[in-house]
């Protein structure tokens, strides 16, 4: 954890990420933005999946110092901070940051694979609907339309859709957006199964002069 935190700090990746974040406070008693985002980053690096797990970081002063933080904030402070960032602002913040982290790995010809997988859901979650689900029939699910580098198995983007939006047409807009963001780093070939061989997806590719299989 400490070594990776030091890497993020030394390379400037964490600093750029914090500077671009749209989170802003007006109260003088509010936590520092760097402490909030640093806590989130340390939690992700530690493999935490729930806000409650953040408590385990409170005693790790070394990792916090590696990111230039004053302290690790509480789980409640982190939850409230992330709730302040609307979806449009978070997308404009995170997508360039994520793309910056992978662009240099795409300097050689590569293949973009498209795949859809069904994620069964338990409990109440937004977008959970009963749709095509061969492993758990009649179980609500999400559909994950995934775009990844074929040779590296490196995920570039995921379109999370409701359980009824399993057809390839629901990935068309996300595919076009990703290709536009890649610019001169576009794949030599876009590859998908027969479900993606429909007119809408093919027009999206041909309109950009993008080879496909």
Label every PLM stretch briefly.
Residues 200-203:
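Catalytic cores of alpha/beta
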Residues 211-213:
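Short hydrophobic alpha-helical runs that function as membrane-insertion/retention elements
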Residues 1-181, 205-208:
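Dynamic "connector" segments at or just before major functional cores
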Residues 115, 187-197:
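Acidic/histidine-rich, metal-coordinating catalytic segments
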Residues 167, 197-198:
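Alpha-helix N-cap/loop-to-helix initiation residues
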């Amino acid at each position: 954890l400490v070594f990776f935190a030091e890497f993020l700090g030394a390379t400037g990746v964490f600093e750029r990420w914090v500077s671009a974040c749209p989170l802003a406070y007006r109260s003088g008693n509010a936590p520092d933005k760097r402490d909030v985002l640093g806590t989130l980053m340390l939690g992700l690096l530690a493999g935490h999946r729930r806000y409650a797990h953040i408590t385990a970081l409170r005693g790790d002063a070394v990792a916090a110092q590696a990111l230039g933080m004053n302290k690790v904030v509480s789980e409640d402070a982190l939850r409230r901070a992330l709730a302040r960032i609307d979806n449009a602002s978070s997308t404009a913040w995170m997508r360039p940051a994520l793309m910056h982290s992978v662009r240099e790995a795409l300097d050689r010809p590569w293949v973009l694979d498209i795949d859809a997988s069904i994620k069964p859901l338990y409990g109440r979650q937004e977008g959970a609907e009963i749709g095509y689900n061969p492993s758990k029939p009649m179980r609500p699910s999400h559909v994950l339309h995934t775009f990844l580098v074929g040779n590296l198995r490196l995920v570039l983007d995921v379109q999370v859709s409701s359980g009824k939006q399993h057809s390839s047409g629901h990935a068309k807009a996300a595919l076009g957006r990703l290709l536009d963001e890649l610019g001169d780093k576009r794949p030599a070939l876009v590859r998908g199964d027969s479900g993606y061989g429909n007119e809408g997806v093919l027009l999206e590719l041909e309109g950009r002069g993008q080879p496909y299989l």
